[in-house]
């Protein structure tokens, strides 16, 4: 009886395993819609770096905090952009930078770093960058 019970538990575990596996939105099986969302988020990532690099304080290593981005001179021109993606970017505190993409920005004495994370992706895909302007893509180790 113990052997049968162990077999049933093992069998059910093997059946449930794939059902419990996370379906990542970005990766080898990424849909065209998710790839487009990811491109839009990359545009937003580049936009944050441009706002930070093209403001007067950048030469002295002074950068905008997240709550200051919406008031940046470069940010004021986003709504006039020919790019629909750029026009959809929201820099208002407490809002998604793009639908289901969250901006986290931290300014230090010597620079800044930020992450734009896909909040709809169970695997946590994100773009990460800093004052050097290099953009990384990442997700948590699984």
Where are these regions (language model features)?
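Extracellular/periplasmic head regions of type IV pilus-like filament subunits
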Residues: 25-35, 50-122, 129, 139-141
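Sec/Tat signal peptide C-region and signal peptidase I cleavage site
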Residues: 17-21
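Positively charged n-region of N-terminal signal peptides that target proteins for export
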Residues: 1-4
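Bacterial N-terminal signal peptides
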Residues: 6-16
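Membrane-proximal amphipathic alpha-helices
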Residues: 34-45
């Amino acid at each position: 009886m113990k052997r049968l019970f162990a077999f049933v538990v093992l069998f059910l575990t093997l059946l449930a395993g794939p059902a419990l596996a996370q379906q990542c939105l970005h990766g080898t099986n990424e849909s065209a819609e998710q790839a487009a969302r990811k491109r839009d988020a990359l545009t937003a990532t580049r936009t944050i770096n441009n706002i930070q690099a093209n403001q007067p304080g950048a030469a002295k290593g002074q950068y905008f905090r997240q709550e200051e981005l919406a008031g940046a001179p470069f940010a004021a021109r986003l709504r006039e952009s020919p790019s629909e993606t750029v026009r959809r970017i929201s820099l208002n505190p407490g809002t998604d930078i793009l639908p289901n993409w969250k901006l986290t920005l931290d300014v230090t004495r010597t620079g800044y770093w930020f992450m734009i994370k896909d909040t709809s992706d169970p695997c946590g895909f994100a773009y990460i960058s800093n004052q050097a302007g290099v953009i990384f893509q990442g997700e948590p180790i699984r």
